[in-house]
Amino acid sequence: QANDLDYASLPDSVVEQVRTNGQLALEGDKGELGEQAILSLAQALDTYIPTPERAVTALDTMPSAVGYQPTLAEEMGVLQERYLADTANKGDLSNIPFGTVNLLAYNNYQAYLTMLGKTTDVTGNCELPEGVEMVMPGDNIKNPGVTKYLPTTSYSLPHVNVGTIGHVDHGKTTLTAALTRYLADLVDDAELLELVEMEVRDLLSTYDFPGDDTPIIIGSARVSAAASELAVQLKMAVVHDDTNPTSAAQTNAPWGLARLSSYWGLTLHLPNLTEEQGVTIDEDHPLFIYLPCGIGGAPGGAAYGLKNVFLGSSAGTTREVEHSDKPLHDISYAYLGDARQNWVMTAQTTQAIRLEPSATAGFAGPEFIVNSNQGR
């Protein structure tokens, strides 16, 4: 780890390293890797970044952001627009790192690219290119072929990343849960829950959200998952459908997606589904696929399968893109500004297909997909 820090020009001599085991800590272990390590980690954070001082009494209404969490772009900060791939001429692959976006500069069509960038903190300042006064999420950039768009962001608050070894989702969530267990006070008095709800509503109203009208359901997901009764889940579902009638749960959808075991299987089964339902997929009738949050590498798997199904070609390779890969005249990208997302975008420039991944935290990247037995 010290060598890695030196390679990245980070101060290994002053970086505090705390060995922990989040699972042991959650199980109540009092040893060096359990509770003691979690408390040492919190102390190290406070010592390394003394300002702003960590709030120990403030009401925390949402989990802390630990590590890479692309879905927080819509929850915690300001979306900036950013495009990382350099312009590439046809056949020129020498300067393109393997796995990043490789788009050809076609001149006979106009591409409308909607690109969402990385998250800035709530006090971040977005520096725009010359001549641009304002950028809003969802702005369209009209340009033939490849677009390079590079506003930068300055941060006024320090950022802390808590790194883990192993599976990024399991590691960071387990460690976050362990930190919460030992550093948060349990509200186990039913009468205090009413006060907590009042504070939450006041906080929502402070930021111009409808605090008085927002439905709040008190429950424990862990307890509900282990219980035979589904009262909390059912109550949440009813409140959601009543509050958002236009996006109510689909109870009679025609496509039997539940019978599929994976998103890769979904892409292989799509031709049969479209034929059964009499659905046409072409430039005038594009296919939109929305993937829910928390599915890890599914966006990459779905994109990989879609390219094989509809184009008969492999995604994530360095071969020159064929003319059959020519994108639609109007393509929308849900862009998160990450190298792994860049590779997903390569697979998304397919005929009449729009893939909108909302979470890729567990995606292992192009090298894993192309070079591993699991990926193949």
From Swiss-Prot:
One of its GO terms (biological process) is defense response to bacterium. Pfam families: GTP_EFTU (PF00009). GO terms for molecular function: GTP binding; GTPase activity; translation elongation factor activity. Signal peptide: none annotated. Keywords: Antibiotic, Antimicrobial. SUPFAM superfamilies: P-loop containing nucleoside triphosphate hydrolases. InterPro entries: EF-Tu_GTPase, P-loop_NTPase, T_Tr_GTP-bd_dom, TrpB-like_PALP_sf. Coiled coil: none annotated. It comes from the Bacteria. Has antibacterial activity against Listeria monocytogenes. This is PCM7-4. It comes from Bacillus velezensis.
